[in-house]
Amino acid sequence: MEAVPSSDSYPAVENEHLQETPESNNSVYTSFMKSHRCYDLIPTSSKLVVFDTSLQVKKAFFALVTNGVRAAPLWDSKKQSFVGMLTITDFINILHRYYKSALVQIYELEEHKIETWREVYLQDSFKPLVCISPNASLFDAVSSLIRNKIHRLPVIDPESGNTLYILTHKRILKFLKLFITEFPKPEFMSKSLEELQIGTYANIAMVRTTTPVYVALGIFVQHRVSALPVVDEKGRVVDIYSKFDVINLAAEKTYNNLDVSVTKALQHRSHYFEGVLKCYLHETLETIINRLVEAEVHRLVVVDENDVVKGIVSLSDILQALVLTGGEKP
């Protein structure tokens, strides 16, 4: 879905960060990010879907599915500017807010326009669009993603007002990984997760195999997490239910019955699902990063030797450690 092209697809990258400096190796990734612009990461060709705010919500979500994208910038033709993003989180919020039962159609999803939903959703807390210039550094992009607790950052040309690209944690880490072998390896890359304390290890939001989808949606809304480990009666992870899985309800037009279990809702991908991507506290940060990038996933579930969930390590956690804190716990 969010594959990043090979290094050949990117504009030529200047390796000025390789010059000898007195800085410690622990800051090489920070220096790299500060010396490269968002423009450097934009592939020569990529798909971008834009929605007008007058579009029906339902049509917009179907369009996300059809185009294989997870989010789209919103264009307000009255204001002649981009005003926000429509994401799978919006789909989850609408379903959770308006679902009554399998027998009652969700009128708001079927009939509302995007602008109507935004008026309802943002009435208590107007949030201006968080975006970035193509000339801003990747360090600024990572800082903005983490500071604003967002997963998508539109790159908007300040002169034309056009959206050029959508930056994500995954794309930034993949870009860094393309050049990572050229750096002297920082000391913290050889340290374990346990030593570095990267990730979340308290109050992990989880669901059981029998948990209804509607309850899972409520946990997404309340905890603002992007995935929920699915555990058995002994707390062992057997699956994972992510926000991206929820959009399948639109693909299959099954969003009118949210009383089914998450296990049943996940059956659609059983033929290609390779299992939950896991890691252990004793594994090094380097191993974790390689696994995340190669598997193209957004997080790993930290487990013990019995597969009991101990924590979650997300791309956001990794980028914060690599770029903002130099391997130190923030």
UniProtKB/Swiss-Prot annotation:
Q: Where does ATP 1 bind?
A: 70, 85-90, 130, 151-152
Output the PTM entry: Phosphorylated by ULK1 and ULK2; leading to negatively regulate AMPK activity and suggesting the existence of a regulatory feedback loop between ULK1, ULK2 and AMPK. Glycosylated; O-GlcNAcylated by OGT, promoting the AMP-activated protein kinase (AMPK) activity.
Q: Which residues are ADP 2-binding? A: 70, 170, 242-245, 269, 277, 298-299
Q: What is known of its domains?
A: The AMPK pseudosubstrate motif resembles the sequence around sites phosphorylated on target proteins of AMPK, except the presence of a non-phosphorylatable residue in place of Ser. In the absence of AMP this pseudosubstrate sequence may bind to the active site groove on the alpha subunit (PRKAA1 or PRKAA2), preventing phosphorylation by the upstream activating kinase STK11/LKB1.
List the top taxonomic levels of the source.
Answer: Eukaryota, Metazoa, Chordata, Craniata, Vertebrata
Q: Which GO terms describe its cellular component?
A: cytoplasm; cytosol; nucleotide-activated protein kinase complex; nucleus
Q: One GO molecular-function annotation for this sequence?
A: protein kinase binding
Pfam families linked: CBS
Q: Which residues form the CBS domain?
A: 43-103, 125-187, 198-260, 272-329
A single GO BP annotation from the record? cellular response to glucose starvation
According to the UniProt entry, where does the motif AMPK pseudosubstrate sit in this chain? 138-159
Q: Which residues carry this modification: Phosphoserine?
A: 261, 270
Record protein name field = 5'-AMP-activated protein kinase subunit gamma-1
Positions of ADP 1 binding: 85-90, 130, 151-152
Superkingdom assignment:
Eukaryota
What is this protein's function? AMP/ATP-binding subunit of AMP-activated protein kinase (AMPK), an energy sensor protein kinase that plays a key role in regulating cellular energy metabolism. In response to reduction of intracellular ATP levels, AMPK activates energy-producing pathways and inhibits energy-consuming processes: inhibits protein, carbohydrate and lipid biosynthesis, as well as cell growth and proliferation. AMPK acts via direct phosphorylation of metabolic enzymes, and by longer-term effects via phosphorylation of transcription regulators.
Q: Which residues form a coiled coil?
A: none
Please list the residues that bind AMP 2: 70, 170, 242-245, 269, 277, 298-299
| Quaternary assembly | AMPK is a heterotrimer of an alpha catalytic subunit (PRKAA1 or PRKAA2), a beta (PRKAB1 or PRKAB2) and a gamma non-catalytic subunits (PRKAG1, PRKAG2 or PRKAG3). Interacts with FNIP1 and FNIP2.
Family recorded in the similarity comment: Belongs to the 5'-AMP-activated protein kinase gamma subunit family.
The segment annotated Disordered runs over: 1-24
Question: Where in this protein does the record say Phosphothreonine is found?
Answer: 263
So where does ATP 2 get bound? 70, 152, 170, 242-245, 269, 277, 298-299
Q: Which UniProt keywords apply?
A: ATP-binding, CBS domain, Fatty acid biosynthesis, Fatty acid metabolism, Glycoprotein, Lipid biosynthesis, Lipid metabolism, Nucleotide-binding, Phosphoprotein, Repeat
